[in-house]
Each structure stands twice: as structure tokens, then as C-alpha cells.
């Protein structure tokens, strides 16, 4: 187990290094520079700006200086606002983290519950309703769901104030982000639950007179949750990427909307920092998921 964790940590660090390398050189390969705008600047001004931000140095030197700063928690400054990027991330990430955490918890809790109900009431009307819901939701991307929710609640019902938290709505963005992973977890739980209920140890437990409650929640559900756990890592990645659009739609000042804005404004240092920051979260989430997966089911051999 210890060797596996060390191996995965090394692989995670290498992955983040490759992402930083690709992001850095991709940003520098873009023909249009960060200081180009509709209002032309003189060569002297451009030269002064490049010298100020160290963009006049060789790319290898720039990358070395950039990574040296990152390792000390310094992502540099925004080329558009001249603010420290660490401060911008520190202000906006808690908003995205709250939104993402609520969406993930909603997806997991309701997905497991609905999937279990569908499995236990297979081929009956609750199962058919849940399957219809899953099929409908999985066919729509999150931004379409967000648009429909806005139209229904805000325009048709006019109850936008009932779902506000401070200056930002929280329920509708959480629903927009959680419905797609919730549908997938529902389908995954149902399949795993049906498979678990058909195993020999379940039949043995029933033959011994074990209470139905214990059979379902202690034996069947516990094993059915293992595939769900493996999905948590990719789900977090999906929620992070989906939040970029959702935060823009609902005008939430989280890290996702900041990322979209910095792309629009060609704020290259902000793009690199945000990409690297989100990559660390996604790689870390997948690493933790794999370790928890191994702990829950020691029979699984991970290379």
C-alpha cells in the first residue's frame, strides 16, 4: 500500500509538471500577445511592458522563474489588473469550492438513494420514473439545464428571490451542476446494486434469516458503492469544468467565471495559474479516490 501511494504521488507530480509545461508554452505560442488590443501601442511601450513582466527573457528562463514562484505559492500578477493572482484565487476559489461541494454532495446522496430505489423496485413504476429521469438528464449538458432552470423558476414562476443566498443564487447553480452527475450515479448505483443483490452471499444471508434491512444496507449497498467511489474523482473534474459556464450564466464571482474572463481578456498569467491550480485539485481528487478505493476493497490489486 505504501509503495502504491508513493508511486501515485510521483505520477501525480509528474502529471502536474507536464500540464504546467504544456500550458506555459501553449500560451507563449499564441500569435496575439497579452498586450495587444484595439488601441495600438508604440514599440517602446510594448518593450517596457515586456521588460516589466519579464517577457523579454528566453522562454526557458521565464518558465524556470514561473515555476520557482509557483513552488513558493506565488503565481505572479495578472497582466490585466496588475493584482497578485494568489489574492484573486484566494477570493474566488472559496465561492467555487462551496458551489462544487454542495453539487457533489447533492449528486452523491440523491444519486445513491434513487439508484437504490430503482434497483429494489426493478420493473415497477418508481424504477421506470427514475430511468426516464436519468435518460432525460444525461442527454442535456449542464448549461442547457441551467438555462431551463432559469427560465422556469425566474421567468415562469418568478421565485428567484426565494433561492438567493446573499447576492447570489445558490440552489439553481447547485442543481445545474449536480443533475448530470446525479443521473450517472443513479444509473451506476442501480447496476451495482442489482449485481450485488444477485451474489451468493446475499442468498446465503437471506437463507440464514438475516433481516432485510441489514442485507440491503450492510451487505448489498456497501459493495454497490465501490463503483460510485471510483467515479468521485472524474465527477469533481466535471463539476470544476462545468462551473466555468454555470458561474458565468448565474453571474457568480467564483474561480470558474474568473477563468472565462481571463480567457476573454487574454490574461495569460491568470490562465496559466488557474489551469495549474485546477489541475492540482483534479489530480489530487483522483489520487485520493484511488487510495480510498483500495482501502475499502483490499481485494483490488492496483499497479
Protein language model features and the residues they cover:
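Hydrophobic alpha-helical transmembrane segments of membrane transport/permease proteins
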Residues: 15-64, 157-172
